[in-house]
Amino acid sequence: MNKTNPTIALVAGEVSGDILGAGLIRQLKAHYPNARFIGIAGTRMLAEGCKTLVDMEELSVMGLAEILKHLPRLLKIRKNVIQTMLQEKPDVYIGIDAPDFNLDVELKLKANGIKTIHYVSPSVWAWRQNRIHKIAKATHQVLAFLPFEKAFYDKFNVPCRFIGHTMADAIPLKPNRAEACQMLQIDPAQRYLAILVGSRGSEVEFLAEPFLKTALLLKEQFPDLQFLVPLVNEKRRIQFEAIKAKIAPNLDLHLIDGNARQAMIAADATLLASGTAALEAMLCKSPMVVGYRMKPLTYFLAKRLVKTDYISLPNLLANEMLVPEMIQEECTPELLAEKLSAYLSDDESAVKNRHILIQHFTDLHQKIQCNADKQAAQAVIDLLEGTENV
């Protein structure tokens, strides 16, 4: 490797990966001003100077049916990436998330003597644990956002570095509620519940009804309570409004385009689907209840496949039931309202418990606030310069 101008390959498959890739490139350019960056990039990575083989949108497919429909094209892109990398011989290949695409590329490149890093651990600790063996064969190192992920890799002697979470870097330890209310143009003197029904159509389909019915119950109990409903895009908004027209036509809601983070900071509590949103709510210091429903067959299979005691990231990080998880038959308006009312109550013990929970959230935030972009870049530098065992 030329010490001053390495060729660094990065492949991102969706917007979240493009954001990570851009942050990583920025840090690597500070160390290697003349480095060359190639791969599959979105607009942010392109702006940082990465050359792309194809438009990143070509890889952004969700759901089994969609993947099957686009499979020939995806396989063609993967073949093209492998051939290009074997010709270019980059000093390192960094697969950013998109494990179903990237791990096969990494496997081929590592077998041909190219150093590989997988950035963002697949959820092997939760399900399909046998993937760990493929990851071990495919990568020289995994970069993990969360400490329990590294602990899992350590058990299998797979090189892994905990780098902290970029979201923990982006959100202050003490979020500014007044600022969030101002951004959303809402009255800071009011009390709010944030309701996040998920970003996928299937989540809105299963969760909008119980979440709206929960809001109706809470409105009876707390007449002054207002509701903030951030929706990820126009499609989800139309879907949600159609369900609301049937379930709660007279319920006043603040429907918000995006801005989930500001909604959670402004709110006194949050009702949400599981997923990254639960981690974000924790970082926003918003007491939360996690509710989730899926098709009975999906739930039956998931229960047998998932190997963890908890499903939400705050509970996984704390390794205890910090926040209620109301899954499937427990995801009822009555139970959700009961759990949320404990956060919204003014009585002394409820206020004290809320303070204790927020302190837990702050402690966990500090644990994963490590300047992840910089840590990721350092891991790449160590691998390139031979200070990391390969």
Swiss-Prot record:
GO terms for biological process: lipid A biosynthetic process. It is an enzyme of class 2 (transferase). Its EC number is 2.4.1.182. GO terms for cellular component: membrane. Transmembrane segments: none annotated. It catalyses: a lipid X + a UDP-2-N,3-O-bis[(3R)-3-hydroxyacyl]-alpha-D-glucosamine = a lipid A disaccharide + UDP + H(+). GO terms for molecular function: lipid-A-disaccharide synthase activity; phospholipid binding. Pathway: Bacterial outer membrane biogenesis; LPS lipid A biosynthesis. InterPro entries: Glyco_trans_19. Keywords: Glycosyltransferase, Lipid A biosynthesis, Lipid biosynthesis, Lipid metabolism, Transferase. Belongs to the LpxB family. Condensation of UDP-2,3-diacylglucosamine and 2,3-diacylglucosamine-1-phosphate to form lipid A disaccharide, a precursor of lipid A, a phosphorylated glycolipid that anchors the lipopolysaccharide to the outer membrane of the cell. This is Lipid-A-disaccharide synthase.
